[in-house]
Amino acid sequence: MDKKRHVHFIGIGGSGMNGIAAIMLGLGYRVTGSDLKPSAATRRLEALGATCYTRHAEENLGDADLVVASTAIPPDNIELVEARKRGLPVMHRADLLAWLMRRQKGIAVAGAHGKTTTTSMTALVLEKNGMDPTIVIGGELSEIGGNAKLGRGEYLVAEADESDGSFLKLDPVIEIITNIEDDHLDYYRSVENILAAFRRFMAKVPESGLAVACLDDPRLRELLAGYDRPCLTYALDNPEADYTMRNIRLMRQVTAGDVYYRGGFLGCLELSVPGRHNLSNAMAAVAVGRFVGLAFEGIAAALKDFRGAGRRFQLTGEVNGIKVIDDYAHHPSEIKATLKAAGQVKTGRVVGVFQPHRYTRTLFLGERFGEAFEDADVVIISDIYSAGEKPIEGVSAKTIVSAIEKHNGRKVIYLPTRQEIVDYLVQMARPGDMILTMGAGDIWSAGIELVKRLKENQKIG
């Protein structure tokens, strides 16, 4: 790697790619990349000195001596084919992240849900306490002005992507595992295979390192039985964990609880972000912070300043008392947690707008979506965002609509397109409503358009 000076990223705007590209720029590498359209991520990289092309073409490679791609890039991609024709080394994004992690001590955050928020919280704890970590996150963290930052300290904090098994390429010193769910079954095919992958991941922890695991999660409890590496556990509901929380307060302005370590009181933890699940995420950051030598008071102060990660209960806008919030939630458990958080801070109706993500996820988890929307007063479902998948016969957004109606016994509003959703919401929204756009696709843009339309109507009125 040290002899390679020009790195080309195929799909440079992707959430797993652009942060690594930014770090490579900071290390002095020449960075080029391609994507199908410009984005905030590509514009930010260009401001840092990268060259970003808005189409895939052989000539984009230029004189690159290393090409980086993710699992999302198909093998017949024109740039990938050209790179192999030239005999250029092609590296998976996780291999490059692993190389970066070897330059420092890696802290990797894995799990079905909460990775981005927990990574952001952990990174902020180290950053605010003067440890100057390198940070690579899948979402935006306002405190660092993006999703990546090159630090000169001892640690690198990063998300570990289990969706394609590539987290097994990493060799962190510290691991956080938030939970294990039956997601990404298009890759793993069975829960047993998911558990086997996490077992291998946890076995990577060295004797000098630490695994931090949530004891509230039943599948993690299963993996921890007989686990022989250094480990600390945390929980909100399991008193056997090393880190526990009592006196939990879920209020409109603050989310708080009292933190204990092996029965000893450490102090109160207050968050500005809503949701009981965020207290759990914060407990993982507390465990890591104390392991690397930080005082609880400094950790708690940093977490109190945390304003949330991009697309994680993020305010899109507020017009005439109508709040529009966006969240990446796309798994039933994530949707349930997001809507419960909304219930904590709502002043009127909670309107859940969900764009299903992938045909395979809808196929495998369709019935479980039925119970995910219990805390929404109004539910709107759009067509599936395919993420490049081919349609599956008999699987559609109506699979989820039927599951919700069967579970809740009430009508779900099916609006296939974002435009239909915006038109409907402009007419039905009223002061006090909290409208949540949820999904891993492009449903966020409906929220932006809705805020724009509501503002226009306000001017006319």
From Swiss-Prot:
It is an enzyme of class 6 (ligase). Its EC number is 6.3.2.8. It is found in: Cytoplasm. GO terms for cellular component: cytoplasm. It catalyses: UDP-N-acetyl-alpha-D-muramate + L-alanine + ATP = UDP-N-acetyl-alpha-D-muramoyl-L-alanine + ADP + phosphate + H(+). One of its GO terms (molecular function) is UDP-N-acetylmuramate-L-alanine ligase activity. Pathway: Cell wall biogenesis; peptidoglycan biosynthesis. It comes from the Bacteria. Keywords: ATP-binding, Cell cycle, Cell division, Cell shape, Cell wall biogenesis/degradation, Cytoplasm, Ligase, Nucleotide-binding, Peptidoglycan synthesis. ATP binds at G111, A112, H113, G114, K115, T116, T117. InterPro entries: Mur-like_cat_sf, Mur_ligase_C, Mur_ligase_C_dom_sf, Mur_ligase_cen, Mur_ligase_N, MurCDEF_pg_biosynth, UDP-N-AcMur_Ala_ligase_MurC. It holds the Pfam family Mur_ligase. One of its GO terms (biological process) is cell wall organization. Belongs to the MurCDEF family. Cell wall formation. This is UDP-N-acetylmuramate--L-alanine ligase.
